[in-house]
Every structure is written in structure tokens, then in C-alpha cells.
Amino acid sequence: YPQDAADTATLLRHADLAMYAAKQAGKGRYRRYAHSMQAALLDRIALERDLERAIAGGELRLHYQPLVDLATGRIVSAEALVRWPHPTRGMVPPAEFIPIAERSGLVVALGRWALDEACRQAAAWSHARAPGAPRVGVGVNVSGWQIQH
């Protein structure tokens, strides 16, 4: 106790951080408070704020992974993949920002943006295709939250 906090309020905040870290580690786990937990929390809060700004400010990008028909060599569809080139952190991996979006509720705005952007791109590809060429479908993975909202 004495090394973890100087007063009761701080001790309780630190205990909460340790409890959430234990929950994140899985059922039946425990964690002792470590100063790195506070830094990790502040980093997640900053990343959430930055993600909200990125969605509103057009910082996100969609990359497309093609699905190719091996028999013909033609692209039959493409999967839209959200990428985030953060201005100071560099490329933030989806495994890092998608859970934050889900926990914060930003996943609905993120999904809406991805659907709108993928539809715009699909329309552009459709207008640019050669006469008689087959259309290319576009797939977008969305969260269950997106469907409910």
C-alpha cells in the first residue's frame, strides 16, 4: 500500500486500474497496480480522442484487397480495409484502433464512413470500367454495433 499511493482516493483509482487490467487478461486473473497501467490508460484516452478527430477529419484511408479468380486472372471483388496513418504515431494497426472504436462507440461512425467511402469507390470503378467488363463487388466488414444502429 504505501508504495502504491499516498492517499485513499489515489489508492482506489490504482485499484480500479489493476481490476480493469485483470478483467482484460481474462477470467480468474489478478493484476497488481503498476505505474505503466496509468500510462497505458492515458495513451488509450489520447488514441480515442485522436480516432474521433480522424473519423471527422478524413484522416482514415481505405485500402482494397482484391479477390482474384484464379482461372481467369480477373479481379472479381475487393475487400475494403480501414487504415489509419496517424500524423504523429505513423500507421496505427487496426488491431489497436478497432477495439478502442468498439469500446467508445466510435465504431458506428467508423463503419458509416467506411461504407460511404467504399460505395463511392465502387461507383467510381463502375463508371471507369470498359464497356462489357464485369462489375467488381466491394465487401466491407462492419461491427455488430453498426447493424444495430
Give residue spans per PLM region:
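Short, basic/aromatic recognition patches
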Residues: D43-Q65
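Catalytic-site/binding-pocket detector for metal-dependent nucleotidyl cyclases
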Residues: G105-L106
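Short beta-strand edge/capping elements of PAS-family sensory modules
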Residues: A9-T10, G28, V76-E79, P93, ...
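A short, well-structured catalytic beta-strand-centered motif of the EAL phosphodiesterase domain
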Residues: Y64-P99, A118-C119, G139, S143-W145
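Helix C-cap/alpha-to-beta connector motif
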Residues: W113-V142
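Residues at or immediately flanking beta-strands
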Residues: R29, E59-R61, R135-G139
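Cyclic nucleotide signaling catalytic output domains
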Residues: Y1-A25, R31-A46, D50, E96, ...
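Catalytic core regions of nucleotide second-messenger enzymes
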Residues: D4-D7, K23, G90, S126-V136
